[in-house]
Amino acid sequence: MAMKPVLFLKNISLEGPETMELFLQKRNIPYEIRDIYAEVPVPRDPREFSAVVPLGGPMNVEEEERYPFLRDEKRFLAKCVEEDIPILGICLGSQLLATVLGARVWKNAWSEI
């Protein structure tokens, strides 16, 4: 049986999987990149994937009115949690996951480096 792909969810064009993509390529591990910021929908069924990696972006987790795809991304991540699909959140992706899990996320007093 073929291995299910790892899914990367891109929230902005310039935030891609970079070295993670190279890691997977070198090991012949299948992966898929979804440009959800460009209105590419999130998948319906998270069980199609071996793991999900929501990536970064400059937006805030609560800016769903300005970035409607965030709402769909949160719903999809909640389904991943329900189905025990491994999730690795990067930057904004970790904040989205934290929100889905019920944690409080807020703006830090200091900028990131």
Regions found by a protein language model. Give the residues of each.
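Short alpha-helical
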Residues: L14-E15, Q95, I113
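Residue-level "edge-of-site" marker
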Residues: Y37, G93, S111
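Ubiquitous "structural anchor" signal
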Residues: E64-E65, L97, L101
